[in-house]
C-alpha cells in the first residue's frame, strides 16, 4: 500500500458530528468531547487509583463519572446510545488500543495493515487483505495507539530504531507487530498479525486441511529423529503455526531452547524461550544474534529458531561453526521453490562468515538435511512439500529431492525415499 498516492478524499468519513452545549451557545464535536473526557480523567485519577481499578467494571465506573462531569459542565445532552458510545470510546482510548480494539476482538481477523492514518487493511482468515474505512483521526492518533502497543510489548518508538518487530498478548491471542517509522517509509507503517487463542496441534492441522495423514506420518518420524530441518514459506503461510505444533511433540527428554523474535510460540514448559528484547530508556536490548549466543550457552541438545532472516547472516555463524552443534529446527522466510530456496540458503551461509568459502554451506546441508515448505493457496494454508538434501557421488553439492509435493489440492508422496533413516 505504501506506493499509492494519497486519496483526494482522505478526510471523507472524518466529518465531525456536532452537538449543542452551554444552552445552545456552543457546538461540540464528539471528538472534542472525547478529548475533554480523556483530559479530565487523567487530571482526576492518580496512577495508584488506576492500579486499584483493576477490572473493566471498576474502570468503566470511573470513566462514566468523568463523562457525567464533563457533560454537566458543558451542558451537553446526549441520547443514551450516544453517551454509551462516548464511554466505550473513552475506555478504548484510555485502557485499550482505540479503534483497533474491535478488530482484536474479532476472531476472524488475522492481519491488520496500517499505512499512516490514511489507509488500513484487514485480512480475514487467510484471504487477501481488504481495505477498511478510516480508523484514526490523524497521524498523531495512530502514533499514540502504536506507542501504547509497543509499551505493552516491552518496547518503545525511538528515533534510533527506525524499524521494530515485537510481540504481545491481547485478549489471550499472541500478537506480533512490526512498525516502520517515517524515516524509512512514508508515514508510520504497521503490520499486526494475530494468532488464534488455541494453537492447533498436528492432528488438528490434519483435520483442518493444512496437511494429510500421509504427510503427518512422514513429519512425526522426522521430528522424533536426530536430524535438523528447515520450515520455509513466505509471510503468513503457517510457518510458526507448524513449528508450534511440532514443538509440542518434541521428545520430552531433550533439552530444548527456542530463539524467538516476537514470542509468538506457545511452548510446553520444558522448552526454554529466549526472545529478542528491544532497548527501553537506559535498558539495553538483546538482538536475535545475542539470544542465539545465550541459547547456546544453555547447552541445549535441540535449538528452535523463529525466524532466520537474510539481513542478519552473521547471527547463524555459530550454529554452522560449532564442532558439536545441537540439533536445529529453523523457520526461514522464502518462497517454496527449491531453486530459489537453495540459492537463498547458500547465500545466507556464505554471508554468515565471509572468507570461509563453501565450508558453512556444506555445514548447513549437513545440519539441516530436511526441508518442509508451506504456502497460502487459494485462501488456505497448506503444507507444500517435504524434501531432503541427498548427496551425489559426482559433486560436492547435494540434490534437492522431493519426498512429498503439492499436487491436486494436497501434498502427496513423490515415490522418492529418504536417504537418511527415519524410524
Where are these regions (language model features)?
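Hydrophobic anchor at the beta1->P-loop junction of P-loop NTPases
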Residues: 231-233
